[in-house]
Amino acid sequence: MKISIITVCFNAVGVIEKTILSVISQTYNDVEYIIIDGGSTDGTLDIVKKYENYIAYWISEPDSGIYNAMNKGVKYATGLYCNFMNAGDFFINEKVLENIFTSNRNEDLISGIAQIPQGFWYPPEEKNISLFYFFKKGFCHQATFIKRQLMEEYPYDEDLKISADLLFFI
């Protein structure tokens, strides 16, 4: 089953290579890597071009914000699931995707543990999550895989500058 990993970035020369290497070093083979750049001018594109043989699709053009870039990434994705591994983010090791997707999955959303500067972010254990949970904790993009069909059906609200992802999850 194909997984689409989408990186959105803008002027991320200091962190983009770590993200790219994290994605392309995954041992799971059916990965489509997409990079949506907002028109970087700092050398980010030189790094992207260095790895373009590993990238299924990349584009560099101005966008109207992060949610516009994320929606654009979903538009080009062909995988069953999408994950956003934005510039500066990385998988904890090279077996993350293999550990998740070796067995056939059919959940609409898969969320795992994420290491963040404050410690660890843990996904909810419940199948039915309350609205209160979203306002308190939310979901961590880097540790969440969402069926592409859902992302196409319910795109991020590009009029919002923050929290459009919260609205999506609700």
Predicted segments, located by residue:
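Conserved donor NDP-sugar-binding/catalytic core segment of glycosyltransferases
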Residues: 90, 94-124
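Conserved nucleotide-sugar donor-binding catalytic segment
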Residues: 112, 122-170
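Glycine-rich, basic loop-to-helix element that forms the pyrophosphate-binding segment
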Residues: 60-77
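A conserved acidic beta->alpha catalytic loop
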Residues: 37-46, 86
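Acidic helix N-cap motif at the loop->helix transition within catalytic regions
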Residues: 14-17, 42-50
